[in-house]
From Swiss-Prot:
Record EC number: 2.1.1.191
Ranges of residues in domain PUA: 2-79
Protein encoded by which gene: rlmI
Native organism: Citrobacter koseri (strain ATCC BAA-895 / CDC 4225-83 / SGSC4696)
Full protein name: Ribosomal RNA large subunit methyltransferase I
Keywords from the UniProt entry: Cytoplasm, Methyltransferase, RNA-binding, rRNA processing, S-adenosyl-L-methionine, Transferase
InterPro entries noted in UniProt: PUA, PUA-like_sf, PUA_sf, RLMI, RlmI-like_PUA, SAM-dep_methyl-trfase, SAM-dependent_MTases_sf
Protein function: Specifically methylates the cytosine at position 1962 (m5C1962) of 23S rRNA.
Length: 396
């Protein structure tokens, strides 16, 4: 008999709506003992079967659901089915947009909670973010090897969130050859270098693909400021869109060096690209004091908020940085501003931009809305999967 997690009375509603998480406060008791990440059955207070999931005794998310089908076992065949389902959608996207790189598995939204897999050419980059994902590592890798025999697998599970579930950080090759120091990929006509081993996340922010393309329609003959530029995806796209100048700002010299290489790789005019190593907040204030002006500003900061206790501080940070950006824009200029914080709702982010405009003494029109690219889908039963939001704002 399998280990069972019994829910408290009345706490089964979210599972009946097929939400994939069980929080610790919803648990009445455990029947049997389960190790970290082990597969358990989840039942209501009367013992009625609801789901099968992974157990995490130290996490606020006490269980993450693998399946709502009682007949489905969690084994290699299960992961093979999930991979096949996910690949069908990515095949269509890759053909439509001419992609050789995309998010193959987007966690809960692809029915694999705690698992992120990005494909860069013939490299699969894996992040196992939950105890259940780690427990199923061998089965998942076996399924990947069967489905993608041409691909090498590299582990980038060096993510702090693993510590919350009692796991160590891991990184390194799993199967196949080691990724090159910089791997070229293609995106909407751009060639971009990706640092799989040492870059942010899995090496590159695939979720901003559509936003980078959208930037081109605003930048012709314009002066562009690209804040938190990382390896210059927005800068390359702006140059391809015909900008007069693009200034890329980041604290990492290594990222800026790759950004410069990306401009050169695409045979674009390097004299139109400036790379500045600096703190964005400080530099924006310095630009304001010097009365510098731009026509387009891209504001794509890292996540400011990891948990609810940080939300108020994050709101202040987002407001301050967007206020400074608005002050630097010429009349009729465009601010492309983003938040990748899952706890920051689209409505709250829009209100923050509105408040920033008031503090800047400028009127702002919202003219376009952005979200993560379509290879980062959001399943209807898990709205938390929508984490990236953005706006194009015309500043009067």
């Amino acid at each position: 008999m399998s280990v069972r997690l019994v829910l408290a009375k009345g706490r089964e509603k979210s599972l009946l709506r097929r939400h994939p998480w069980v929080f610790s406060g919803a648990v009445a008791r455990m029947e049997g003992k389960a190790s970290l990440g082990e597969t358990i059955d989840i039942v209501d207070h009367q013992g009625k079967w609801l789901a099968r999931g992974a157990y995490s005794p130290a996490s606020q998310i006490r269980a993450r659901v693998w399946t709502f089908d009682q007949a489905e076992s969690i084994d290699i065949a299960f992961f093979t089915r999930r991979l096949h389902q996910a690949q069908q959608w990515r095949d269509w996207l890759a053909k439509k947009d001419g992609l050789d790189s995309y998010r193959l598995i987007a966690g809960e939204s692809d029915g694999l909670p705690g698992i992120t897999i990005d494909r860069f050419g013939n490299f699969l980059v894996l992040q196992l973010l939950s105890a259940g994902a780690e427990y199923q590592r061998a089965a998942l890798i076996s399924a990947l090897q069967t489905q993608y025999p041409e691909c090498a697998i590299y582990d980038r599970s060096d993510v702090a969130v693993r510590k919350k579930e009692g796991m160590e950080l891991t990184q390194g090759p799993v199967t196949g050859e080691l990724p090159p120091a910089l791997l070229p990929i293609e995106e909407h006509g751009m060639k971009l270098l990706v640092d799989i081993q040492g870059g942010h996340k899995t090496g590159y922010y695939l979720d901003q693909r559509d936003s980078r393309l959208a930037t081109r329609r605003y930048v012709e003959n314009q002066r562009v400021l690209n804040c938190f530029s990382y390896t210059g995806g927005f800068a390359v796209s702006a140059l391809m869109g015909g900008c007069r100048q693009v200034v890329s700002v980041d604290t990492s010299q290594e990222a800026l060096d790759i950004a410069k290489q990306n401009v050169e790789l695409n045979k674009l005019d390097l004299s139109k690209a400036e790379f500045v190593r600096d703190d964005v907040f400080k530099l924006l204030r310095a630009y304001r004091d010097r009365r510098e002006k731009f026509d387009v500003i891209v504001m794509d900061p890292p996540k400011f908020v990891e948990n609810k206790s940080q939300l108020m501080g994050a709101c202040r940070g987002y407001k301050d940085i967007n206020m400074l950006a608005i002050q630097l824009l010429n009349p009729g200029g465009v601010l492309l501003t983003f938040s990748c914080s899952g706890l920051m709702t689209t409505d709250l982010f829009q209100k923050i931009i509105a408040d920033a405009a008031i503090d800047a003494g400028r009127d702002v029109q919202f003219i376009e809305q952005f979200r993560q690219a379509a290879d980062h889908p959001v399943i209807a039963t898990y709205p938390e999967g929508l984490y990236l939001k953005g706006f194009a704002c015309r500043v009067m």
